Amino acid sequence: MTARPARWSPDSEPSARFPGLVDRYLRRAIPDPSRVPYRVRVTQRGRMRMKPGGRWMRFHATEDFQVRSVAFSWRARFTGPLSVLTAVDEYAAGTGRLRVRLLGVVPIATAGGPATARAQAQRYLSELFWAPHAIVGNPELRWRVLGEHAVEVSTMVAGSPVAVRIDFDDLGDISTVSTPARTRLVGSTAVDTAWAGRVSDFATIGGIRVPTRAEVGWQLPDGPFVYWQGHVTDIELRND
């Protein structure tokens, strides 16, 4: 039987488990600590492109975040003028994989292996703002203060740490997430590339306060390349 995630209360004393910046953030992000889920389901709409100057494709997606372990599953349906693509990006127990299919049947892209696992673990870390209960309940996370408005969160993948930097604004909300090295596929070659995401428009959805808009991109030699933009349409705290 899986243990229930740890409880946390905004009325409790500051926790030594994570930095003060994170503790203050949680006090706003989880207004009702009595609702403790096993996982958080986020529904998104947005657009994504594969290369600078490339055509944007609209998508609708659901993403499940585990609260007690570093694990997620993102399932998306992309629509374009000539085709429909489905994508599954997921990570659990140190293993990650990405699958893209045409019409949900014909495989057109796959990725896996150690580099993919590290990149997907970083994705989980960078999206903790959509599952704040995982900050409290996930024992696989480690925290380090980087400055007055920044922390680092890390986890282990195959015995080696992976980390993401989280920056907060003057109000105490998360504003950006970043890493100097995240795996980017260039053809069939994995290249470590600087990566960053920005979030905004905080609102309470499904009982938690989250950023409802986000965009992410690579920091390329020619300048930033934003490849994903999306907004949250629904959040469910689930115990199934």
Segments and roles (model prediction):
Residues P37, T62-R75, T86-R99, L146-H149, ...:
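Short, solvent-exposed coil/turn segments at beta-strand boundaries
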